[in-house]
Amino acid sequence: MAFSFDLAVILQRERRRTKRRRRDLCKSRQPIPEIPFDLVIEILTRLPAKSLMRFKSVSKLWSSLICSRNFTNRLLKLSSPPRLFMCLSSSDNSHLKTVLLSLSSPPDSDITMSSSVIDQDLTMPGMKGYQISHVFRGLMCLVKKSSAQIYNTTTRQLVVLPDIEESTILAEEHKSKKIMYHIGHDPVYDQYKVVCIVSRASDEVEEYTFLSEHWVLLLEGEGSRRWRKISCKYPPHVPLGQGLTLSGRMHYLAWVRVSDNRVLVIFDTHSEEFSMLQVPGDIFWKYNGLLEYGGKIAILNYTKVDIEGVMELWVVEDEEKNLWSSKILVVNPLQLQMVNSIISLTVLGTTRNGEVILVPGPEDKTVFNILLYDLQKNHIRKIEIKGGPDRYLNNIWEVVGMDDVENLMYL
C-alpha cells in the first residue's frame, strides 16, 4: 500500500515538473518571424508547376496569388525544360481515338543518334476525335472539322470554344472549305487570342479565286468566348499549313489565286491588321516550312534535299520593301541517308537553340523519331522516341510541337 502511495506522489510531482517546464518554455520561446511576402513569391516561382497546383489549396491568399496574372507572367519568363508533344491516333469502329503524350527534349549534343523517353500522358476524355494543330506558350489548340478546343498542358484544363455561328462560309454546304485556328498573344494588353481563318474556293471557275473570313476570340477577360469578325484589306486567301507566332505576330503561307505565287500573310495580334509579302517565285509550297532564324521569319525549302542533298533558306530582311535573302544549305553526305530514309518531312519550327525540327510524315509508321538540323553547324541528328504504345505503330502518329513554357493561366 505504501508502495502505491509513493508511486502516486512521484507521478504527481513529475506532472507538476512537466507543466512547469512547458510553462517556462512558452515564456522563453521567441515568436517565429513572419516570412516577407516577396520572399514567399520568390520561393514559389522556383517550384515546379505540379507543386504550385497543389499549393493552391493552402489558403485563399495562396490560391489568388498563384492564379494571378502577374505571378503567371513571372513564371512564363522563367524557361522550363523544353518538351516535345506527340499525338497518336487510331481508328476503332470509325471512331478516332487520340492520345497526347509528352517527353523531355534531348540535350544539345553532336552525337548523330540518341533517344528520348515518353514520360507523361496528357490525354483528356474530351479530346476524342480531335487533332492537335499546334502548341503556343503552354496552350494547345485541338481541332475537329469546324470545332476547336484549347488545352492548358500545365493545369490540364480543357475548354471548348464556341461555334462561329455568324460565318457565312461555314453555313454553306461546300466541299472545299478550309479552317485554320491559331493561338496568339497581344503583348501590349497581355491578352491571348484565337484567330480563325475560314476559306473556300469561289464559284467562279475561270478566275480561280477564293473567299475567306477572319475571326478573333479573346480567351479571357471582357468580351471573351465570343467571336468577332475582322476585316482584311488584302485579297481573300487560303492558308497553307499551320502558322508561326513571332514577336506578337502570326505568320502563315497562303494562296491568293491558284495560278499565282504564294504569299506570306502577317497578322498583328494587337492591332488585328493583316499584311502580305510576296514569296520568292521558286519556292514550292508543298516542301517548305516556316521557322525563326536569327529573330526573323524564314522559309526552309527542302524540295531538293532527297535528290541533290540541298535545302534553301529564305529570310525576310525588310517587310516594307519585300526584301528577302537566301542561303543554300548543303547536307553533309554522311548524314544524307537519315533524310533519304524518310518518305516525307514536315518542318515543325526550331528548338530553343535554333535547331530545325524535321518530323516524318504519317507514312512513316515503323518507328517514332525526329530529326534536329543545326543550320550553323550543318549537322543533323536523329532522336528516337521510346516508350510509345506499340499498338499505334500502324496508325497515325506525329510530333505536334515543342514548348518550354509552363502556363498557369486559368482559361
From Swiss-Prot:
**Know the name of this protein?**
F-box protein At4g19940
Q: Which Pfam families match?
A: F-box, FBA_3
Annotated F-box domain ranges read: 29-75
Q: Record's InterPro entries?
A: F-box-assoc_dom_typ3, F-box-assoc_interact_dom, F-box-like_dom_sf, F-box_dom
